Amino acid sequence: MNIYDRIMAIGTKMTEMDASTYQGAFIGKISYMAEKEQAEQADNISYQFGEVKENAFMYILPILGYVEGIENPVEKFTVTLVKPSDKEKELKRVAAASYENAEPFHTFSKEEVYGFSKETGDQNKIHLTEHPVVQGMLLLRTAAVQTADVSRIDVKFVEPSYAEEALMWAFDGRDYVLFADGYVKATFRIK
């Protein structure tokens, strides 16, 4: 299976979770690891939830991808959801540096965001408004497709990305930095 189809299958599996449990939480981090050769050669990957871990601040939700005849998972996907807080927190924006190697990442249309929600079954209202937030999984999928030879991606989200924002990214020597309008949206460590 190609990386596009695998990320879509994981996104669809995520929508099977009891969303009411995680209402108001937001994605802080995503880690995706694959046994690249095995995952690409597979005709079908079966996704299962791993053991959910929780503390006072977050949920850690694993999804494991299995191929028939192979004992260990060929993919491991972990999403860290940050629990909502009773305290009002002001968003601390992180200014993007000036990058000589900056290039366009993507400008997601509202229709792309709505379409991704429809295709995966995601009914989170923040992705369905007039000014929708771009799904973390959609950002992950776009980065994975744009990057050759991916076996691991770790994404840390800094602030929401919105439809119609001209997203740029640049390599800072360690991570790819996703930014728009002078502010960091996320960082991607890709191996």
Enumerate the predicted regions with their spans.
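Active-site helix/loop of acyl-thioester processing domains in fatty-acid/polyketide metabolism
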Residues: 1-39, 123-125, 131-152
